[in-house]
Amino acid sequence: MKESQVYLELNRSRQHDFLYPLIFREYIYALAYDHGLNKSMILLENEDYGNKFSSLIVKRLIIRMDQQNHLIISANDSNQNPFFGHNNNLYSQMISAGFAVIVEITFSLRLVSYSQGKEVAKSHNLQSIHSIFPFLEDKFSHLNYVLDVLIPHPIHLEILVQALRYWVKDASSLHLLRFSLYEYCNLKSFFTPKKSISIFNPRLFLFLYNSHVCEYESIFLFLRNQSSHLRSTSSGVFLERIYFYGKIEYLVEVFCNDFQNNLWLFKDPFIHFIRYQGKAILASKDTSLLMNKWKYYFVDLWQYYFYVWSQSGRVRINQLSKYSLDFLGYLSSVRLNPSVVRSQMLESSFIIDNAMKKLDTRIPIISLIGSLSKAKFCNTLGHPISKPTWXDSSDSDIIDRFVRICRNLSHYHSGSSKKKSLYRIKYILRLSCVKTLARKHKSTVRAFLKRLGSEFLEEFFMEEEQVFSLMFPRVFSTSRKLYRGRIWYLDIICINVLVNNE
């Protein structure tokens, strides 16, 4: 019943564009901290007082903050101002977590209302990170160039607030958000060291960042649709915002004056745009000259329309046939796959050389060894070393940890076209496990393996074979070529920490 109350009240507040009153509802914080909605009090520990706090403290804090003038408060006043210090960090986390839940649910309700009248593909399989690679196999083999874009960060806090201003019209909520950003983050940049960001809720941070980046995508989508006369529904939800429609009137005039002579150069029905982890990829069948135009278009768009400083070096042009693209833990490139076809017509026969383009996905072995080196599994040259911090665990726990890491890496990199690099990673983890156990028992690696045997480490290499033997028993019994092929899984929703080492 209370779950319905949450959505009903959100709907009523959304109709009047008032989100600020929801900050004072305890069930908002129950949703934020995954507590049951039947609990009347949200309990959080604070080591300064030793007792518990309810959301009533948050209500009082918001009232007192609203009466403060944050322009005359500086971070150096933390000893004099009662709002600063450890208690204030707790309050900031609670308020930002509640605000994150409010804007997320409000945005999701808007997304649902938008998608009801449109045919939007819904598939849980598309949530997998690996689902993008079959798409790349079908599309990238016909494309020539890729723009590897490093999306710039906003240099001022007000830019992040403006991203919400045009669809959240509640001035009180925006004032609270602006106050929190200025109080608990660096005054010059939102992207400060981890110590400063840790007091701010990461969900709200990601929402603000994605809302800001969606403004880039809206303008890019508008220009792309105007130039190629193709309609896209994947990002259509962002086209309904008042902010975007307000920009269209201004952009039409700008395009007529500034892009009238060269807008036709952008006509390309083979443009594919992918955004991930603060980066973006723009793949096209255009020539290098046209890709350069897209490159400087992005830079000018960031600087002159969004007031974000950027340089041309943040956008790199990559020719897929010559260079590899570092994308989601894989080095992707397009290579020619030569084939010879013999044809016979009547008494004459001739040979046809045919070369087909194929997407090649390889493991970035150098960066992956660097990640293993930082995690103390090997040195910088890739030689396995023991893991002394795990020596206090039992033998079964140590083996289970190594096997789990090995399986996760094998699972994620199952789409590699060359398995040799994957075997090397397995070898590093396997020998590191043996050295860790040998060091724990104060023995040598040779003596330890001789005493226990090597059967207990077969899990490192047998898991994939067991999976394939269950999936394809007949094929697997006659040939193991399938095991050497590329397999994309549909259950990978996050990148392994060792893979995502940037």
From Swiss-Prot:
One Gene Ontology cellular component annotation held by this UniProt entry: chloroplast
Keyword Glycosyltransferase part of the UniProt annotation: no
InterPro entries hit by this protein: Domain_X (IPR024937), Maturase_MatK (IPR002866), Maturase_MatK_N (IPR024942)
Listed name of the protein: Maturase K
Superkingdom field: Eukaryota
Species whose genome carries this gene: Theobroma cacao
Key word tRNA processing present: yes
Similarity field: Belongs to the intron maturase 2 family. MatK subfamily.
